[in-house]
A protein has these predicted regions:
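Compositionally biased terminal segments of proteins
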Residues: 1-250
């Protein structure tokens, strides 16, 4: 379980329409619901959803940040707002990264919040959320699990596909890439695949569809000894996993 998730759930129990959690925390929540293990994760990645009563949510959010004693960094660009909250005290998530693509609106940083420096390499998520295809895909896959707003497994999988492909391309271009992150995203696709209901069909378009095709092509070309799903306790090998992905998305 993610440290601090209980305080998060309690604070935002009436506001699940205003955010969606993705990334490792979403994986942890979804797999825990299915009584499956997941690696330890301390951070919450969340996307703001701008509804009519958003200022009410914003007030509650800042209460939580102050109660948790967080420091805050932010980068506001023309189309994307990014916030990073760090060093939450005991009982609160270690870090919260928050994204919004609402044009002309951002969370007003309140007094009493200690600022931190944010480097230029914030997150690949910023780029993906600027894409209308991925944003609409995310909006169509939101659900509530145990009082927390998350992206459902069948919609989270293409985000993990994108993350793996993005790191793979950067590595091929000669950039330094954390091999643990590369491995993590590769396997998260199949971890989540375990809990997608049999017979599920998911529609996508544009860049989402392109990335799904690209992932299937790339993962199929990897030596099967490097995609050891059965050894990790999954109920299928790489080839069967790829077949299931095709049945769901293509």
């Amino acid at each position: 379980m993610v440290p601090g998730i209980d305080s998060f759930r309690e604070k935002f129990k009436d506001y699940t329409d205003y955010y969606t959690i993705i990334g490792g925390t979403a994986c942890d929540i979804l797999l825990s619901e299915a009584d499956l293990p997941f690696r330890a994760t301390k951070d919450i990645d969340m996307i703001l959803i701008m509804e009519d009563n958003f200022p009410e949510f914003a007030a509650i959010f800042w209460e939580y940040i102050k109660e948790g004693g967080y420091k805050c960094g932010w980068k506001n660009e023309d189309n994307m707002h990014f916030y990073r909250f760090t060093e939450g005290k005991f009982g609160y998530p270690t870090m919260i990264e928050l994204f919004s693509r609402k044009l002309g609106y951002h969370l007003e940083i309140e007094e009493g919040i200690i600022p931190i420096h944010i480097d230029d390499d914030t997150s690949s998520l910023s780029a993906i959320l600027l894409n209308d295809d991925f944003y609409k895909f995310m909006m169509s896959g939101r659900r509530v699990v145990d009082g927390i707003g998350v992206l459902g497994a069948e919609h989270l999988i293409p985000f993990k596909m994108y993350a793996w492909i993005n790191l793979l391309e950067r590595k091929r271009a000669g950039e330094h890439v954390n091999e643990k992150d590369l491995k993590k995203h590769k396997y998260d696709v199949f971890r989540l695949l375990q809990i997608v209901t049999a017979g599920t069909k998911v529609e996508s378009e544009g860049l989402v569809t392109e990335n799904i095709h690209r992932y299937i092509e790339e993962i199929s070309a990897v030596d099967e000894s490097e995609v050891r799903l059965l050894q990790m306790g999954m109920p299928f090998d790489r080839d069967r996993g790829v077949e299931l992905l095709k049945e769901i998305y293509l």
